[in-house]
Each structure stands twice: as structure tokens, then as C-alpha cells.
Amino acid sequence: MTKNKKEFTEAPVNFGANLGLMLDLYDDYLQDPSSVPEDLQVLFSTIKTGEAHIEAKPTTDGGGSQAGDSTIKRVMRLIDNIRQYGHLKADIYPVNPPERQNVPKLEIEDFDLDKETLEKISSGIVSEHFKDIYDNAYDAIVRMERRYKGPIAFEYTHINNNKERVWLKRRIETPYKASLNDNQKKELFKKLAHVEGFEKYLHKNFVGAKRFSIEGVDTLVPMLQHTITLAGNEGIKNIQIGMAHRGRLNVLTHVLEKPYEMMISEFMHTDPMKFLPEDGSLELTSGWTSDVKYHLGGVKTTNSYGIEQRISLANNPSHLEIVAPVVAGKTRAAQDNTHQVGAPSTDFHKAMPIIIHGDAAYPGQGINFETMNLGSLKGYSTGGSLHIITNNRIGFTTEPIDGRSTTYSSDVAKGYDVPILHVNADDVEATIEAIEIAMEFRKEFHKDVVIDLVGYRRYGHNEMDEPSITNPVPYQNIRKHDSVEILYGKKLVDEGIISEDEMNEVIDGVQKEMRTAHDKIDKNDKMNNPDMEKPESLQLPLQSDTKDFSFDHLKEINDAMLDYPKDFHVLKKLNKVLEKRREPFEKEEGLVDWAQAEQLAFATILQDGTSIRLTGQDSERGTFSHRHAVLHDEENGNTFTPLHHVPQQQATFDIHNSPLSEAAVVGFEYGYNVENKGNFNIWEAQYGDFSNMSQMMFDNFLSSSRAKWGERSGLTLFLPHAFEGQGPEHSSARLERFLQLAAENNSTVVNLSSASNYFHLLRAQAASLDTLEMRPLIVMSPKSLLRNKTVAKPIDEFTSGGFKPIITEDIDEQKVKKVILASGKMYIDLKEYLAKNPNDSILLIAVERLYPFPEEEIKEVLKSLPHLENVSWVQEEPKNQGAWLFVYPYLKALVANKYDLTYHGRIQRAAPAEGDGEIHKLVQTKIIESSINN
């Protein structure tokens, strides 16, 4: 049988499932060498004459060989098994190695082979990288076993991309020349001594204090240091690190170089800022309520690694793994050039992310899968994240058998087609090589790499915890196990690189350094009365932008947005819709609807020099087919983005349809905005109802980051919200939750009823970016109101004015007996009802900004109504949801027993809305009529 030559050359070199094809091709070669590709002719020619005809010994074990197989076929099967499964017998466990069941055949004997037979075969059949190094297949296989079963275990045969597999195979099997000379090994030992000495000192001097020790995976710190050095060699100047609490204090101290004095001060509850380096190289921020020490991050600017680099450790809550997309977003922001026209350009060599995981949390938390899914997407890729799993093989008290369904905690990463390296945390030099392989792979392919750093946990989950209660046997062995500091020190002593006295001198010297730092701190300098007031910059609500625009200016923008290339063919049906956007400038009755108001706002913001990034599911078109920010040629599918062609544009416009993810995408956009505070970042939910998939991002980052960490964000959320008969899962963005989180002017929450007010709001938010006044903006965006003529406004409302927290009507104040307050679609429903059923005794007020609540503005209106008897709040949400419970205390204070205060809306409900559209209409009508007539 003759195979197509192309069929093999495009097939995997690491045979795997294609091993049968390889063996068939070898049989073809024996019959006719010209029947196989030239590269295989070269490989097969290295086999010594006659050796392929040595018959296999009969076997009945069903394992490695089959009766009658040639020796070469059995050798190939052995080699293939070593590559695929050698990791299962690798020396990657410092202590308490697991018992492996049903491990595939990996030994020479399993394939009815022996040394004598293998010595007759060329080493080239084992690996093309061995043919000029080893005399025969036996020596080459011994080398392969050492490589694949050593302190680094490799998993890469699952990768679909042939080039990546070939590259990894070559890198793994090419004899490795150690990158560390004797002096570097000495320095590496000193680093380890500082890592462990730091932990020992704190353990001894602050007994029982939580620090979430790094001990057991100490080599993480030199791995990070080496990564930063290699990144510097590549010219990467921005390093973004994300990690949870374990080992964080050590990373802060030895990677970001936070002084020992500062760290010890935090344990003593004295003021650490007295010891902040005066050269400005270390940036540490904190909010007015602050956070525990093992959540805090920082930024270090350093030349320690060869070039000036900015190393950032992201602030992190206790919620494991949720910082991963934040770090990815921060990295992408550092890579993007937003100071140009059109879309931003991305340079993967400007920044890189390092995301550190826990072995229990990595497979357990879905945010990791969402984040890894972003890795190769145009709008989110960072050119490859370095993932390091600090694998201490336990989660609090839960052992792997109860914590995951896979062999390794890293197995979930295989679905994302990335290489996985397992490395023994006690083999210091192996951990350095693992980093070097990972960095070389990232540089070559711009993809994620996972390093599983396999170690242990010296103490319990925290230092007050006794692990032997639930894990007695493993901890008997851990307590007897020498630390990596001692193991590596002894190794260097044995190699003659240092003496035992030098080793002990280094270890003792770290304790002296720590004691010297400790002695500098005045234990009486307690922070008894910390300032917990929000900063002055947050005393006022978001201020309106009052810039005026001429009619001609806005018309020029609008015309440019409708000017497409001559060879671009807009879908005819869509073109008719878009052409109507000329009417506000050409017809007296023409109105600007929501989508056009947004486009005009974005265009003027770009002219002001503020870049915009908008992402979300279906955001390019808009869930409700209203935005059309990216147009598609109906003949060839090419795309055109009008906002890339704004006259006098000074910054980029970036828009992407996101994957079907909420938590990771919101985290990514949050991180992007934190890193690039001048960028107008917007995340749009497909429906507001789905935004609660990101609730942890809202709770732990968006609403509280500034109070905890001094971390400013101006992220904007568009959350479609309105009760329109679409059922309980397509009605509510859970407005009440955002209002519950609102405090200390930490955000702006709006539910708008006017396209022009939307225009001015967006401009106000953009103007606040990269100032001390910036804060998140939460918009309950419309659905049916997108095309509502009551919401649409004439162009003169856009040329001047500013954002209005409330909107009132022109009315005879002497006649008003009742004020109705409502927002969003509820206000429009009431307005349209009153237009058909006029009532001079009712004043309808649109509360556009719910937080900060416009008390003074409403108070002024109420004071002007001498015959007022009743104030009513009307909403479409159930009474226990929506804004009512939030606004009630404000309204109660405003009426001050002068007027009746009543509520009109749905009764308290467990589910937000009715499932039947007709019942919805009945309930909605009842709310409107009740509020008007009662």
C-alpha cells in the first residue's frame, strides 16, 4: 500500500494516534524507499541493515507489542509511550508521591525489548536529535527516559498544531545546556535563603499571625525573578502578575522589593508608609478602609533585571482565581496603542501576564476556563499568559481525590491546546529550565503555557490551622522533609560550589537582616485613629460636561458616519435605516434616537482625544439591532467601522463581540481600565439579567476597589433593563443590587428616558476619566425605548446643555397636587399615558440619576408646589426589587410629613416578572392607572 506523501508530512510528528500510519509507511519503505517522503527516507535509512526483520517474541499481555511485530515497530511504540505518558512516572513529587493505577507500558521490557537488541539499532530511530550524539537506540532511550521521567514532566502531544508539537519535541529532546554558572547558582541559593528566612522570621516573631506561607513552593519566587529577567532580555518592560494570598507576602517582598520594614510594620499594626522608598520606585496605594495585607498589590519600577521594567502585582480579594481576567485586561491595555486613529495596534512584546493559581482552585473555579478561552481571541489575546500552578496538593483540608476528577489539576488546560510542564518544586534548577522553555514557547507562538509547580504546604491553610487533624499521614512526612533552601544548599556543597560554612552564613545572615529591619520600627507608633473618610474628590456626584457644539459640527460628524467607501455595499434594508439618521439635520421634525445619540457622543469623545473600547455579546450590531457600529458588505462580507473615520479623530475606537462569558469579560474590561485610566471602557450585557454572572466582579472590584485598595476605575456598564413581557429572565438587570452597593459616591447609577441626556451623560463620564473624580457608571439601558419617539430628541438638545439628574415638565405650579417620580421605561409609559389623558394636577418627574440620589434637585421642585398633597414613587419592578427600597429613606426625608408618600408598582415577588406577555400588560396597565388615579 502506498500513502500520499503530503498526507504524512502534514500529519503529527509525535505519532500518537498516527503511530499506525508511521508503521505502515515504514513497511512501504522496506518495499520501495521512494514511496515515502524524503524526510522519512532519511530517518528510515539510519536503521541498521536487517534489524527491522528481527521478529518479536510472542506476547500474551496485550500491552506493548503484538506477536509478529517488527522490532522497529515495538521501539517506536515504546518511544511514543514515553513521550505521551512518561509524565506519569516522572520525579515531580518532593514528598508523598501518589500511587498511579493503570499506567501505560513505559519500560523496555514491556515491549519485549532488551539492551542487546536496542544496541543494534541506530539512535536516530528514537529521535532525530540523538542520531549524532548517541551510538545506539539503547543509549538514546535511556536519555529519553531521564528526560521524560525526570524532575520536569512534559505534556504536549495533545496539542493540535503540528509546528508547536515539533518545536516542543525538539526543545525537550535536544540535550539541554544548563543556563546557570556557579555564580548564578550561588545567587539562586541566596534568593532561596531570603525566601525561606523571611517566612521563618515571621513564623517565630508573630506566632499565629496569618501570612499564608509560601513554604513548600518556595521556588516560585526565583521562578518569577528569572521570568522577569528573561522578559527584560526580550524587551518586555511591563509585567503584570496576579495571584491569591498564598505566598503573596513573599512575592511582594522579594519580587516587588517591598522593604522588610514595611512588611514587619504591617504585622505590628504600625505605619508602614514611613519606610516607603523615597526614590519613587515602589507604588503602594490603599483606600480609606484598606484591606488585609495579603490582598494588597503594588507596582515596582526597577532596573534590577537589565532594563527599566514596571512590575505590577494586582490587588486581589479572597475570591480565588477571579483576578485572572483582571490581569489579562491590564496586560492588553499595556500592549494597546490607543493614541492613534482607527483601531488600536497591539504589541505583545510590550507586556506579559503571569497568573499564579492554586491547585485546588484552578480546576475548581470556572473563571479560569473563561479566561483561558480569551487567550486567542482578537479582542482579548495578550500574546500568551504564563500560568503557574502553585501545587501544594491540598485545598484547605481537601485532598485531590475529593477536589477534582482529573489526574492533574492542570488537566483542564489541555482543552485550550497549550503545553503543560509539571516540575518538582524541590529541584531548583529544573524550575528555572521550565521557565526558560515556557518563555521561549511564548515568544515563538504567542500562546499560553501552564507550569504545574508541584510541592507541598509546610503548615496548615493558615498559620493558626492544624493540618494533622484532617491530613495526618501526609504531614508526618512533610515535617520530616528538608526545605528546598537546605536541599539546594547541600547540593551546592556537594558540588563544591560553596562550603557548608558559607551556606550557614547566608542562612544566618537573612535572620540578621530581618532583625535589623524589625529594630527600626517603633512598636508604640500605632495607627489608632486611621482616616476612614472618602477622599475630597468623591464628595460630589459626577459633574456634567458643558461643552457646546454647533449644528454644523454635529452634522459634519453625522455625514461622515454615513459616508462609506465606494466599493462597500451596505445591506439595502439596513442602509434605509441608517439613512434616516440624516433627518434630524434635514427635517424640522427629525429626531435623534438612542443609537444615533450614542454614535454622536462617541464621535465627539474621540475628537476630544479619549479612546473608547466597547465589548459584549453582539455589541458590534447591538442585541436589539440598533447600534450597527460595524457594517458588513453584503457581497463579500468585508467590514467597515464608521467610528474609525471621525473627522479630527484623536484616539482609537475599539469594539468587539465578546465570547459568551460575563465574569471574565467584565474582569478583563475592569483590568483594562485600571491600567489605562484614560480609556472609556464599556461592557454591554446582552440582557441586563445576565449581568449577575459577574456579580463577584461588581462586589469585589467595581464597587469597592477604591475604598479597599485606592484603585480607581471608570468602567461603564450598559445593562438592558425594562419590563416588556419577556418573562423573568429578560426583564431585570437587578437594579436593586447596584443601588445596594452604592455608597460613598463609589459609582453613578442611571435609568434614563432621554436620548439627549444619554449623549450628555456619556460625555460627562468620558471627561471624568483619568481624574481623581472618576468612578464606574452603571446604565440601565433601554430595549423598546431604543426606537421610541418620546425618548428621541431634536438636535438642539445635543448642541448645548448638559446631563440632567432629573427631568421635569412645564406646568402650572398652582394646580399641582401630586408629584409622580419614576425612571426609565416606567417614566415613558406614564408620560405617554398622560399625553393621552391630560391631568393638570399631576407633575411627572423623571429621576434619571438614581445614585447619587438627586435630593436637592427634587427638593427644589417640591418647594415650588404650594398645593402639593402627595408624592408617589412608581416603578415596574416588584416592591422588594428595583429602586423603591433605596429611594424610600430619601423620599421620606423629603416629604417630612408634609405630604403623603405612596408606592405604586408590582407587589413583592420572588421572581422579577410574569412569564406571560398578556398578564404582563394587565399588570403594567394596573400600575399606571393606579398611580394616576389614586
UniProtKB/Swiss-Prot annotation:
InterPro entries: 2oxoglutarate_DH_E1, 2oxoglutarate_DH_E1_bac, DH_E1, KGD_C_sf, ODO-1/KGD_C, THDP-binding, Transketolase-like_Pyr-bd. It is an enzyme of class 1 (oxidoreductase). GO terms for biological process: glycolytic process; tricarboxylic acid cycle. It catalyses: N(6)-[(R)-lipoyl]-L-lysyl-[protein] + 2-oxoglutarate + H(+) = N(6)-[(R)-S(8)-succinyldihydrolipoyl]-L-lysyl-[protein] + CO2. Keywords: Glycolysis, Oxidoreductase, Thiamine pyrophosphate. One of its GO terms (cellular component) is cytosol. CDD domains: TPP_E1_OGDC_like. Gene3D superfamilies: 3.40.50.12470, 3.40.50.970, Multifunctional 2-oxoglutarate metabolism enzyme, C-terminal domain (3.40.50.11610), TPP helical domain (1.10.287.1150). SMART domains: Transket_pyr (SM00861). Signal peptide: none annotated. One of its GO terms (molecular function) is thiamine pyrophosphate binding. Its cofactor is thiamine diphosphate. Its EC number is 1.2.4.2. Pfam families: E1_dh, OxoGdeHyase_C, Transket_pyr. E1 component of the 2-oxoglutarate dehydrogenase (OGDH) complex which catalyzes the decarboxylation of 2-oxoglutarate, the first step in the conversion of 2-oxoglutarate to succinyl-CoA and CO(2). HAMAP family: SucA_OdhA. PANTHER family: 2-OXOADIPATE DEHYDROGENASE COMPLEX COMPONENT E1 (PTHR23152:SF4), 2-OXOGLUTARATE DEHYDROGENASE (PTHR23152). Belongs to the alpha-ketoglutarate dehydrogenase family. This is 2-oxoglutarate dehydrogenase E1 component. It comes from Staphylococcus epidermidis (strain ATCC 12228 / FDA PCI 1200).
